[in-house]
Design a protein with these regions (language model features):
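Alpha/beta catalytic barrel-like cores
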Residues: 1-151, 273, 301-310, 317
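Non-catalytic scaffold segments within catalytic domains of secreted glycoside hydrolases
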Residues: 59-90, 208-220, 224-233, 247, ...
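A general structural motif
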Residues: 125-129, 181-183, 223-225, 244, ...
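Short acidic, glycine/proline-rich loop/turn micro-motifs
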Residues: 143-146, 197-200, 288
């Protein structure tokens, strides 16, 4: 693991983006990021620019058992493929650390290619880190069905091979990002965790922890700080107890749910963890949320956690804004 990763990370209210932007024009999206976040840029994911940039499809090309229908923007499990050959191919690459077969193909990540190119040509002297994202293992495993119509995460053999391919894709992303900035943050997008705890959620907590930690440790081993982004509510104690470096939550709409777990938050912060506060509303944005309103809401939330015994000084030091 690289020495830079072992340093304590105190972002102290630095801001970055979660990842997806609604732009249809990639150049406009890149210009917005470059102008507003020169210290802490992220590469924008642009599903409205091209459906191939949606998080499941973007991560899928070349993974074992899967086929992408580019015309329809769909990912399918191909039950006709030779299981042994599919697994042999991905495990051979994984053991050899060969990431090239798992690079993101051209046309699947214009935002990524554009931001890397921008930093190669015009890297700001104030650059502190470069942030990217990839779909997390739980969300991916619940989004794709196997040949029997089951969530692929429950097909242990196939999913382990698919996850190894996803880990290789993440390695490639990190290595590419590090060519332009040594300090890399990679978020795992996990909207699928919002369903955890309901009667309809089919994955148990031990599987969630095991698969998340496998992914987190893999990317930490590449020298990246790893975050998990969950846009709704989940069992925050489960997520905070993983080996994740950064937990990104919706501080505008779901702070009260996170605040139910003060002991888990304290333990997470004591290990050097960072809370990324999604204080800027997206789906609930009305146009009346001024900077002053957002600051006051953030201060109120800090005070609430301080009343629960969490150091406000530590909260401020370990605060990233999204």
């Amino acid at each position: 693991m690289e020495a830079s990763y072992r340093k304590t990370f105190n972002p102290c209210f630095l801001a970055t983006g979660v990842g997806s932007l609604p732009h249809q024009d990639a150049r406009r999206a890149l210009r917005l990021v470059a102008q507003t976040l020169p210290q802490t840029p992220f590469w924008p994911q642009l599903p409205k620019h091209r459906i191939l940039e949606s998080m499941i499809i973007q991560a899928s090309p070349g993974l074992p058992f899967l086929r992408v229908d580019e015309a329809k923007g769909e990912v399918h499990f191909d039950a006709n493929l030779d299981e042994a050959k599919e697994l042999e191919k991905v495990y051979r690459s994984y053991l050899a650390r060969d990431v090239e077969p798992y690079r993101i193909p051209l046309g699947y990540a214009d935002g990524f290619e554009g931001m890397v190119r921008h930093l190669e040509e015009r890297k700001p002297s104030s650059l502190q880190f470069f942030k990217g994202q990839i779909v997390g293992p739980i969300t991916f495993g619940l989004a794709v069905k196997d040949g029997n119509g089951k969530d692929i995460i429950h097909n242990e053999v196939a999913f382990d091979g698919i996850l190894k391919g996803l880990l290789l894709r993440g390695r490639w992303i990190i290595q590419r990002m590090k060519k332009v900035c040594q300090e890399v943050i990679l978020f795992l997008d996990e909207p699928g965790l919002c369903g955890y705890g309901s009667a309809f959620f089919s994955v148990d907590g031990s599987t969630i922890s095991r698969r998340l930690n496998e992914t987190i440790e893999e990317f930490q081993g590449q020298g990246a700080r790893v975050g998990v982004h969950c846009c709704g509510n989940t069992d925050w104690s489960l997520l905070l107890s993983t080996k994740v470096d950064i937990v990104n939550f919706d501080a505008w709409g779901f702070f009260e749910r996170l605040a139910l777990y003060p002991e888990a938050i304290k333990d997470f912060l004591s290990r050097g963890g960072v809370l990324a506060w999604g204080i800027v509303p997206t789906s609930e944005f009305t146009g009346e949320e001024t900077v002053e309103v957002l600051i006051e809401k953030l201060e109120t939330e800090f005070r609430e956690l301080a009343r629960k015994g969490i150091s406000e000084e530590t909260l401020r030091e370990r605060c990233l804004l999204t």
